[in-house]
Amino acid sequence: MHIDVIGHGPALVLLHGWALHGGVFAPLVERLAPHYQLHLVDLPGHGFSRDDSTPLALPYVVAEIAAATPPAVWLGWSLGGLFALHAAATLPQVRGLAMIAATPRFVRGSDWPSAVQREVFVQFGVELSRDYRGTLERFLALDTLGSAHARSELRSLRETLTARGEPAPEALQQGLTLLERTDLRRTVPQLARPSLWIAGQRDRLVPAAGMHAAAALSPHAQALTIAGGGHAPFLGHADQVSEALQRFVASVP
């Protein structure tokens, strides 16, 4: 699995969202690299890990990342949040957890109302097999929908998407399955490490209310909503997100 290591200081592992790669965090890298050693992961089937045959399953991926990185705060955006949360719940080397636009369960349920309908991910899976590039474009548009900086964020995501080659279709299907079926809510109250949950106020994929509901499950959590932010608030609101991360990491024992 490809992992870029940039900067010096306390370690921070960053895990990207569906169809992207570690390069998507460029605005955060610019601001955080002077203070931290950043470990930017390309998940299997994505970016420079496109040919990595590791199944996109939480235990396998987390174990491989953990073996290649030092004790660190783990940050997960969107799909990457599921891997980061699983790591925080199972590995003592995870010092803290930062979740950006990510919850332990991405689909709506009778006891989890602030989420999207399951059919959203099912339909993306169907469309992906019919129209690969068109489906990716529609997903990127959904990532930025509602954001105060939607145009510039969409432009950035489009440029990033294929900068390291196109993601593997099989990995994309596996990622959609994870988003549709994973429910890690039971692990959150057991988190022994501090956590930070950063939501975008206008996020259409992971509503801010869902982020705050997730944070409320953890005994050591902070929650922050970025005003005007969409599903990728670290793009259009990089200063706010990086400042929040620096405050959080400084507070981690």
UniProtKB/Swiss-Prot annotation:
Keywords: Biotin biosynthesis, Cytoplasm, Hydrolase, Serine esterase. One of its GO terms (cellular component) is cytoplasm. Pfam families: Abhydrolase_1. Its EC number is 3.1.1.85. Pathway: Cofactor biosynthesis; biotin biosynthesis. GO terms for biological process: biotin biosynthetic process. It is found in: Cytoplasm. Its main location: cytoplasm. It comes from the Bacteria. Substrate binds at W18, S78, L79, F139, L140, A141, L142, D143, H231. Gene3D superfamilies: alpha/beta hydrolase (3.40.50.1820). GO terms for molecular function: pimelyl-[acyl-carrier protein] methyl ester esterase activity. The keyword Hydrolase applies. The active site is at S78 (nucleophile), D203, H231. It catalyses: 6-carboxyhexanoyl-[ACP] methyl ester + H2O = 6-carboxyhexanoyl-[ACP] + methanol + H(+). The physiological role of BioH is to remove the methyl group introduced by BioC when the pimeloyl moiety is complete. It allows to synthesize pimeloyl-ACP via the fatty acid synthetic pathway through the hydrolysis of the ester bonds of pimeloyl-ACP esters. Belongs to the AB hydrolase superfamily. Carboxylesterase BioH family. Monomer. NCBIfam families: bioH. This is Pimeloyl-[acyl-carrier protein] methyl ester esterase. It comes from Xanthomonas axonopodis pv. citri (strain 306). The gene is bioH.
